[in-house]
């Protein structure tokens, strides 16, 4: 995924989508990935079939099926029902994941406030996401993580930075961490699962401003 010579374009994932109108706005704003939480406790959880209907209504959209503590067979079933091009796994050990899984996988590693990682890192060839640790929720808490920890890892591998990102802090986050991608959910909402369209647009615009400086 890393390339030399070309200006970096930070990928954007808008997660916790539950409505077609929100997904459409995210895509029109320039989001690269649309995230749907299809397995796991979350106020933003959506049935795989409902997520699949949204994806089907947006031809060409790249959907990510977000899941917590699933088996490979479960993950594949949820992904197929969603029409997802990628799966994002929380609370799954990458060491036990089959190498021949047919879809790209993002493994999420929670980070404590003191910078300690709460799960093993996946191998470098697999995409890593860092999110703020929470003892109950797997994501979408609105809490940020220590960006210095993320920056140290981003210097050695591609990673997705999550955890409390919003239109007001994402430029600083990109400047400090220099991630391959950013992920936002609760920071773009007016209520859990209901996106604030103006905040979505502002978020993507802020990422592009950060990229212009980074170039």
Please tell me what each predicted stretch does.
Residues 1-215:
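Conserved N-terminal beta1-alpha1 strand-loop-helix module at the mouth
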